[in-house]
């Protein structure tokens, strides 16, 4: 993959890390646009998957299910270390990085980073180019059988033709881009 794709991923990871770091203890039980997760579970999910992708990209054997991960007392630091490994692996261009599309990794962190930001009342500034790459990857990889109740992804939500790139991506993965937290 290109350096520009890796730079886009780094930007998404950096913004997601900052959002994780800004979560207050009083926000942990707030709902999110991802209906099965509250804020604390989105943080756990982000950290668990960052660690999982870092392990996978390094070629080390997997140790546990990322969806079962529970972050420690400083989740932003855990996320930061895993994100550094992820970026390092893509910059090195090893065999494992060729098997895991950068757009797929970007999709995971951009969408759940958006979930977390929206739920905690933070603004997002994810790059349209990052969202477009993630959306293109998602459209190529996500099969209909992966969508629906009890599945990894919700059904696509319709958005206007003029919707921005991030809104189109989150809608593709079953989120309502107009979702608002009940109270922040």
Language-model segments: residues:
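Structured surface interface patches that mediate subunit assembly and partner/cofactor docking
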Residues: 2-18, 22-35, 48, 52-184
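Extended, alpha-helix-rich binding/interface surfaces that flank or overlap catalytic cores
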Residues: 42
């Amino acid at each position: 993959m290109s350096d520009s794709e890796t730079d886009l991923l780094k930007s998404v990871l950096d913004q997601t890390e900052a959002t994780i770091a800004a979560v207050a203890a009083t926000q942990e039980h707030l709902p999110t646009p991802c209906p099965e997760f509250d804020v604390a579970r989105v943080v756990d999910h982000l950290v668990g998957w960052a660690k999982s992708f870092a392990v996978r990209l390094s070629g080390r054997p997997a140790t546990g299910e990322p969806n079962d991960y529970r972050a420690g007392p400083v989740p932003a630091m855990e996320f930061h270390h895993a994100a550094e490994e992820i970026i390092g692996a893509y910059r090195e261009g090893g065999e494992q990085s060729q098997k895991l599309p950068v757009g797929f990794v970007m999709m995971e962190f951009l969408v759940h980073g958006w979930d977390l930001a929206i739920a905690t009342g933070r603004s997002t500034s994810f790059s349209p180019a990052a969202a477009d790459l993630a959306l293109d990857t998602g459209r190529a990889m996500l099969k209909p059988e992966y969508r629906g109740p009890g599945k990894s992804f919700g059904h696509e939500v319709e958005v206007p033709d003029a919707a921005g790139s991030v809104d189109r991506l989150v809608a593709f993965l079953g989120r309502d881009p107009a979702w608002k937290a009940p109270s922040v």
